[in-house]
UniProtKB/Swiss-Prot annotation:
Name of the protein this chain belongs to: NADH-ubiquinone oxidoreductase chain 4L
Domain of life: Eukaryota
Keyword Protein biosynthesis among record annotations: no
GO biological process: ATP synthesis coupled electron transport
Organism expressing this protein natively: Platyrrhinus brachycephalus (Short-headed broad-nosed bat)
Molecular function via GO: NADH dehydrogenase (ubiquinone) activity
Principal subcellular localisation of the protein: mitochondrion
Family: Belongs to the complex I subunit 4L family.
Compartments reported by the entry: Mitochondrion inner membrane
Gene from which this protein is expressed: MT-ND4L
Quaternary structure and partners: Core subunit of respiratory chain NADH dehydrogenase (Complex I) which is composed of 45 different subunits.
Pfam families: Oxidored_q2 (PF00420)
Enzyme Commission number(s) from the entry: 7.1.1.2
Chain segments annotated as transmembrane: 1-21, 29-49, 61-81
Length: 98
């Protein structure tokens, strides 16, 4: 396993650990999710380029589309919660029920 793959795997695990440990604020959770998606994108792109899989070259772009949709939904939820309650705690999401 090369050093670049190990760095991307470490970035993914650190983002996952940050998501598990700092889950009280929504902004930190969203940043950790974006770090996980970015490291997955880079790892998938490197694997596809190194193995010369031309048929799977569309998969990282599809992952980026899902990451952009996740970021847009997360930011809209963050804006809605912060304008309604004045803080971005994840525990306030239980109060959004109809």
């Amino acid at each position: 396993m090369s050093l670049t793959y190990m760095n991307m795997f470490m970035a993914f695990t650190i983002s996952l650990l940050g998501l598990l440990l700092y889950r009280s604020h929504m902004m930190s959770s969203l940043l950790c999710l974006e770090g996980m998606m970015l490291s997955l994108f880079v790892m998938m792109t490197m694997i596809i380029l190194n193995t010369h899989l031309t048929l799977a070259s569309m998969i990282p772009i599809i992952l980026l589309v899902f990451a952009a949709c996740e970021a847009a939904l997360g930011l809209s939820l963050l804006v809605m919660v912060s304008t309604t309650y004045g803080m971005d705690y994840v525990q306030n999401l239980n109060l959004l029920q109809c």
